């Protein structure tokens, strides 16, 4: 694998399409991005910094080491609590995990793109010293159509939001004039306009549209089916893994509201390299440096609980296992930072008497397949066939790429976009594509999936005919993000539960952004805030449990003495 020094000169030659003369290149400063988001921002999307905690220090056990679990841990450690994280797999990261196979290839669980509105995640990355690990892409959303035809939503403009967005939609070559006009009408009649002057009010209006699909809402405002198929379906698939006919209007309009009010919300970033090295790694180090501990390959088999005389439930421990080892983990606070299928397996059946837990079973995950294809040339180099065949210099489209003409809605050449771990000397493109929805592909063998994806890549980039695949990988996830269908938002649970010392975290839980890396990070902040807010009550419960345990031991000792 090429070192950073070796490959740095190779990937700067990535081709840029549709440059707007005189546009200002946006800087990569996360300081600016976070401060920009905190000004006139809905508090549900970017909470204020927490007060310094002065309550009792608590022992916290977290199940799950994804972004939600690690975000919770960072917040709690900063407030002086003791944190242990338990992960059933041999690596951390959850949905943003990656690992290295025996041949040195970095395998990812999905394609991870950082929208400019991921301000809670940027805040976390800055806190742990990972803010330099993001590469800013050109401020344009690129659509690759069949035959190599490139369309764009180009946000590069001297004037910021909302003007830059209006220009992007009016100037796009992805739609015909009639569809652009109808698209503009629909957006003009949306809560997005209110967001410019009243972000919190607009967010409430958007929440109230959860019951309707984005397509139905869009058509009711004059939008066209062509706009859905050529622009909005690929965009919806990227964050939500389902199309506009099946995704809630709340999800799409939440994103649009941020794009309309924050100049850089639509700006895309990608990691320098693999998530394990450049995202999870720095967070893990921060946690360990502050006394937090990771326990890998320890899975939770059962939540142990009891009830008070008044009927209030509380957790007494976690039954954990690692291969043939078993133990009971005890803490003052327990946090389940799982995905949807994970939390369903974990919750005791008796807890479904509470609507909050029963509603979890109304949520389902979306199957997703991530495919990586390594080529012996540069797939997305459309302007010069000879350059696409040489291996001295990386060339092509360096950005997230959308397409309406393939079963993968979004993809990227990671050898260009994330070169530190994915550029290899003497090799070419590493196309990473996300098949969504993955249902039709789940039963297929990996070789057949690779064959079908390769055919679709060639349809999008005819100039890549003749390039060979050197290596491939396929990762299937039966249930990834929860299916954000119309009417599902009320079933998302809060982070605080009816069980006094048991809390939830996860991107599927209640928070005002969508199920995403940003949503996971925000859920962790919310879970930690609830825990700190209940500090005194949790201390009282700890003392009661200790007294009960001492009493039980005394009773047992007296019984033995009598015998």
From Swiss-Prot:
GO biological process terms on file: carotenoid biosynthetic process
Gene3D superfamilies xref list: 3.90.660.50, FAD/NAD(P)-binding domain (3.50.50.60)
InterPro entries in the record: Amino_oxidase, FAD/NAD-bd_sf, Zeta_caro_desat, Zeta_carotene_desat/Oxidored
Tissue expression: Expressed in roots, leaves, flower buds and lips.
Gene Ontology cellular component list: chloroplast; chromoplast
Known catalytic reactions: 9,9'-di-cis-zeta-carotene + 2 a quinone = 7,7',9,9'-tetra-cis-lycopene + 2 a quinol
Cofactor(s) this protein cannot do without: NAD(+); NADP(+); FAD
Keywords assigned by UniProt, alphabetized: Carotenoid biosynthesis, Chloroplast, Chromoplast, FAD, Flavoprotein, NAD, Oxidoreductase, Plastid, Transit peptide
Chief location bin: plastid
Single annotated GO MF: 9,9'-di-cis-zeta-carotene desaturase activity
Location of this chain's protein in the cell: Plastid, Chloroplast; Plastid, Chromoplast
Pfam families to which the protein is assigned, alphabetical: Amino_oxidase (PF01593)
Transit peptide: 1-35
UniProt keyword annotation of Repeat present: no
UniProt function note: Catalyzes the conversion of zeta-carotene to lycopene via the intermediary of neurosporene. It carries out two consecutive desaturations (introduction of double bonds) at positions C-7 and C-7'.
Family designation: Belongs to the zeta carotene desaturase family.
Descriptive protein name: Zeta-carotene desaturase, chloroplastic/chromoplastic
Lineage: Eukaryota, Viridiplantae, Streptophyta, Embryophyta, Tracheophyta
């Amino acid at each position: 694998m090429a070192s950073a020094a070796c490959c740095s000169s190779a990937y700067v030659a990535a081709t840029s399409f549709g440059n707007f003369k005189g546009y200002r290149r946006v800087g990569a400063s996360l300081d600016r991005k976070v401060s920009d988001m905190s000004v006139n921002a809905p508090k549900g999307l970017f909470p204020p910094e927490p007060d310094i905690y002065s309550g009792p220090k608590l022992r916290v056990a977290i199940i799950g080491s994804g972004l939600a679990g690690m975000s919770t841990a960072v917040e709690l450690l900063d407030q002086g609590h003791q944190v242990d994280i338990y992960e059933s797999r041999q690596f951390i990261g959850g949905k943003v995990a990656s690992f290295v196979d025996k041949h040195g290839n970095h395998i990812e669980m999905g394609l991870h793109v950082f929208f400019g509105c991921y301000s809670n995640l940027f805040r976390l990355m800055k806190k742990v010293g990972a803010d330099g690990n993001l590469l800013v892409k050109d401020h344009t959303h690129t659509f690759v159509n069949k035959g190599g035809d490139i369309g764009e939503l180009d946000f590069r403009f001297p004037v910021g939001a909302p003007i830059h967005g209006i220009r992007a939609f009016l100037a796009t070559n992805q739609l015909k004039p009639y569809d652009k006009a109808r698209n503009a009408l629909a957006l003009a009649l949306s809560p997005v306009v209110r967001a410019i002057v009243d972000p919190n009010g607009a967010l409430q209006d958007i929440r109230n549209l959860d019951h309707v699909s984005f397509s139905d809402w869009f058509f009711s405002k004059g939008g066209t089916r062509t706009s859905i198929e050529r622009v909005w379906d690929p965009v919806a698939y990227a964050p939500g893994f389902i199309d506009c006919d099946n995704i809630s209007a709340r999800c799409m309009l939440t994103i649009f509201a941020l794009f309309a009010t924050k100049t850089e919300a639509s700006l895309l970033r990608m990691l320098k390299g693999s998530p394990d090295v450049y995202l999870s790694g720095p967070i893990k180090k921060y946690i360990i440096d502050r006394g937090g501990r990771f326990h890998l390959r320890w899975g939770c088999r059962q939540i142990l609980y009891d009830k008070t005389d008044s009927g209030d439930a509380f957790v007494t421990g976690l039954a954990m296992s690692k291969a043939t080892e078993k133990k009971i983990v005890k803490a003052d606070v327990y946090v389940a930072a799982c995905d949807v299928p994970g939390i369903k397996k974990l919750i005791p059946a008796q807890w479904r008497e509470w609507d909050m837990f029963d509603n979890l079973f109304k949520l389902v995950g979306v199957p997703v397949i991530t495919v990586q294809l390594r080529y012996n040339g540069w797939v997305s180099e459309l302007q010069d066939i000879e350059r696409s065949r040489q291996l001295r210099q990386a060339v092509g489209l360096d950005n997230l790429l959308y397409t309406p003409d393939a079963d993968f809605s979004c993809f990227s050449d990671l050898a260009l976009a994330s070169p530190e771990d994915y550029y290899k000397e003497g090799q070419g493109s590493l196309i990473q594509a996300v098949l969504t929805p993955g249902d039709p592909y789940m039963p297929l063998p990996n070789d057949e999936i690779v064959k079908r994806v390769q055919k679709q890549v060639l349809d999008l980039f005819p100039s890549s005919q003749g390039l060979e695949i050197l290596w491939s990988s396929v990762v299937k996830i039966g249930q990834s993000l929860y299916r954000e269908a119309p009417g599902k938002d009320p079933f998302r649970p809060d982070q605080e539960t009816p069980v006094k010392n048991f809390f939830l975290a996860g991107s599927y839980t209640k928070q005002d952004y969508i199920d995403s890396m940003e949503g996971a990070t925000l859920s962790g902040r919310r879970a930690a805030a609830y825990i700190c807010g209940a500090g005194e009550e949790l201390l009282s419960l700890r003392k009661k449990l200790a007294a009960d345990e001492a009493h039980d031991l005394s009773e047992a000792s007296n019984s033995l003495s009598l015998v």
